[in-house]
Design a protein with these regions (language model features):
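DNA replication initiation on ssDNA origins
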Residues: 1-87
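Short hydrophobic/aromatic beta-strand micro-patches
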Residues: 92, 129-133
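A short linear hydrophobic-aromatic micro-motif
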Residues: 113-118
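Short, surface-exposed ligand-recognition loops at beta-strand->loop->(often short) alpha-helix junctions
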Residues: 92-100
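Short, solvent-exposed beta-strand edge segments and adjacent coil->beta transition regions
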Residues: 86-90, 125-127
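Short loop/turn segments at secondary-structure transitions that flank enzyme active sites
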Residues: 97, 123, 134
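Short, conserved phosphate-binding/catalytic loop or strand-edge motifs used
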Residues: 120-130
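Helical (often loop-to-helix) elements that flank the catalytic cores of nucleotide-handling enzymes
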Residues: 101-110, 132-145
Length: 145
């Protein structure tokens, strides 16, 4: 589980250049990277300042890394460049009321299948990563034929 590598792109705009990193490395960056922390603070301030959704989307796309938890790619981010599946999935829960966040985190911690979770960039949600078994592994290419 901790050796599984996922593709992480510098931003949502990047389609070719990426790093393959473990969940432990992702978690460490989220918790300890000063640049990422400052960008998150700035993003949350932009939300509080009620910047238009279009500007927030642009800021998010340009300033934050993009994780691809479900699959690894050799080059581009499309089926043509699919290298392998990770067996990992991300659940994104948005709009958690502030008075319920601690309870939501407590409950997620209790789930045995959860590999990692963190608070979302907005501060109002959770990104939850979990492993699943791939049914009929290897049949996916047939779907696209």
């Amino acid at each position: 589980m901790y050796k599984t590598k996922i593709s992480v792109y510098p931003s949502c705009l990047s389609t070719l250049v990426h790093n393959d990193v473990t969940l432990s490395e992702v978690y460490d960056k989220i918790k300890n990277d000063d640049v990422l922390r400052q960008r998150t603070v700035n993003y949350r301030k932009a939300i509080e300042a009620k910047l238009p959704a279009k500007q927030l989307k642009k800021l998010k796309a340009e300033q934050f890394p993009m994780l691809m938890p479900a699959a690894r790619f050799k080059e581009g981010r499309d089926m043509e460049h699919l290298d392998s599946y990770t067996g990992l999935c991300q659940c994104d829960i948005d709009n958690i009321p502030p008075d319920m966040m601690a309870e939501a985190k407590r409950r997620v911690r209790m789930l045995k299948f959860v590999a990692m979770f963190h608070v979302s960039m907005s501060g109002n949600g959770l990104h939850i990563y979990y492993f699943y078994q791939i049914p009929n592994e290897g049949l996916t290419p047939q779907v696209y034929q």
